[in-house]
């Protein structure tokens, strides 16, 4: 599926979005641009698992550039606030960590280097979804590293034992959910975590109605579009009919339910491969993976995560920073290193082939993990993240909290989130339009 970047948004428009962003955290100190050995010093802040291994490998492979890593708190746990603060204070490192949904927030500071000319040759080799993710406003602001398309993981042994077909549509998924509960009254087909705004966004992404897009010089906000409301209504009925659990993915309640065989599936991203292997290692060769069920059989899937890296506009060593980021995104060594501690799904397609070849596998029945993820990545529809996406994740999670108790519904939560998103952008002095236009 071809992806198209949003219409060009003026730099002024993005900068205006900075008003009202929270900024807190420690600032990095200035450092000499060279080391004692004469290598060009490049400073990077990141929370990416394994970044220390990547940095060590790069530094060992050459001696002209010396990368120095400062591990910071993960994005919404302080990383974005720390980086936003540093950019505003003109004291940022050379390289900053940004997931695709977080890049517009960093861009609103005016502190990122435009990498359009530096990286133009990378586009043909990148997954369209990853490339779109680093081009808010139609310019390239970061180097994509990985992508996290969503898929369906399921207990193939239990589905087969009870004769439950693998669902290909959401109607079939509901039928399968009813069959799971009929087979085991304590079991559910999956959980729908009401505490995770990024999960809900990924599920709505599949429906093909972007929550933001650029319309001339304005931001058009469409959180309550038809696709999102259809998604909300579907899952509201699944929750109301007690066909899914509502425990947060990854917490102790979820792990306990998985250990006891009370959850037969997981709607998750590429990184969920590692989550399953670590959480329920005893279930090796019981799980399988397939593409997400679809609406009306039309192939599409959402994305939940993916990392990219930007360069500070005030870096004294931009060429050296870009050199490292090119290596991080495209060098085969990175994919090989990644497979020693995770299941990487690179945004750069040649690196993805290297990761697949190095993948040790063995957990999933049939183990077509990369084949399924590749197919999912090709199904990702157009999407644009707005400058208030990170705050919106928290907002929608707050509204979803009342769904479990029955004090609100998913549909009502979506409509309230739309109102909040519009009010937030207008409070920053931005021109905001609503609906599909």
Model-derived segments and spans:
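C-terminal lobe and pocket-closing loops
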Residues: 272-283, 295-395, 432-437
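Conserved C-terminal helix/tail region of periplasmic/extracytoplasmic solute-binding proteins
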Residues: 160, 375-437
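Extracytoplasmic/periplasmic solute-binding protein
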Residues: 139-145, 150, 174-221, 227, ...
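Alpha-to-beta junction loops
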Residues: 87-98, 186-187, 260-268
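Hinge/lid segment of periplasmic solute-binding proteins
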Residues: 100-150, 203, 288-290, 371
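A structural signal for short loop-to-beta-strand junctions that line the ligand-binding cleft
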Residues: 93-94, 122-158, 188, 298-301, ...
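Glycine-centered hinge/linker elements that transmit conformational signals in sensory
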Residues: 177, 218-248, 292
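Conserved N-terminal structural module of periplasmic/extracytoplasmic solute-binding proteins
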Residues: 2-105, 123, 166, 247, ...
């Amino acid at each position: 599926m071809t992806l198209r970047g949003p219409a060009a948004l003026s730099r002024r428009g993005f900068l205006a979005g900075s008003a009202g962003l929270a900024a807190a955290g420690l600032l990095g100190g200035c450092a000499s641009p060279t080391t004692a050995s004469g290598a060009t010093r490049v400073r990077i802040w990141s929370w990416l698992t394994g970044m220390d291994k990547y940095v060590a490998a790069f530094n060992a492979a050459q001696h002209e550039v010396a990368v120095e890593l400062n591990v910071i708190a993960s994005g919404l746990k302080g990383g974005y606030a720390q980086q936003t603060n540093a950019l505003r204070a003109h004291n940022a490192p050379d390289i900053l960590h940004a997931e695709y949904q977080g890049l517009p927030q960093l861009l609103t500071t005016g502190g990122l280097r435009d990498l359009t000319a530096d990286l133009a040759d990378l586009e043909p080799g990148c997954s369209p979804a990853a490339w779109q993710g680093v081009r808010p406003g139609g310019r390239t602001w970061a180097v994509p590293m990985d992508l996290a398309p969503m898929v369906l993981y399921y207990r193939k042994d239990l589905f087969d034992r009870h004769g439950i077909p693998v669902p290909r549509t959401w109607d079939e998924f509901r039928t399968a959910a009813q069959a799971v509960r009929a087979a085991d009254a304590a079991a559910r087909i999956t959980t729908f975590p009401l505490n995770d705004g990024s999960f809900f966004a990924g599920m709505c992404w599949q429906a093909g109605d972007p929550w933001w897009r650029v319309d001339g010089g304005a931001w058009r906000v469409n959180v309550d579009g038809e696709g999102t409301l259809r998604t909300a209504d579907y899952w509201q009925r699944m929750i109301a009919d007690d066909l899914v659990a509502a425990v947060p993915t990854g917490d102790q309640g979820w792990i306990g339910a998985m250990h006891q065989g009370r959850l037969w599936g997981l709607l998750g991203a590429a990184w969920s491969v590692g989550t399953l292997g670590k959480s329920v290692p005893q279930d090796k060769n019981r799980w399988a993976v397939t593409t997400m069920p679809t609406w009306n059989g039309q192939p599409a899937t959402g994305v939940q995560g993916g990392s990219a890296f930007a360069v500070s506009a005030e870096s004294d060593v931009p060429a050296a920073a870009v050199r490292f980021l090119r290596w991080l995104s495209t060098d085969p060594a990175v994919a090989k290193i990644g497979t020693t501690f995770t299941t990487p799904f690179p945004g750069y397609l040649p690196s993805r082939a290297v990761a697949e070849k190095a993948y040790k596998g063995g957990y999933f029945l049939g183990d077509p993990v990369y084949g399924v993820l590749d197919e999912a990545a090709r199904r990702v529809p157009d999407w644009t993240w707005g400058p208030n996406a990170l705050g919106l994740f928290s907002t929608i999670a707050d509204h979803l909290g009342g769904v479990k108790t029955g004090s609100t519904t998913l549909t009502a939560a979506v409509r309230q989130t739309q109102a909040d998103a519009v009010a937030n952008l207008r409070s920053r002095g931005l021109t905001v339009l609503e609906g599909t236009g």
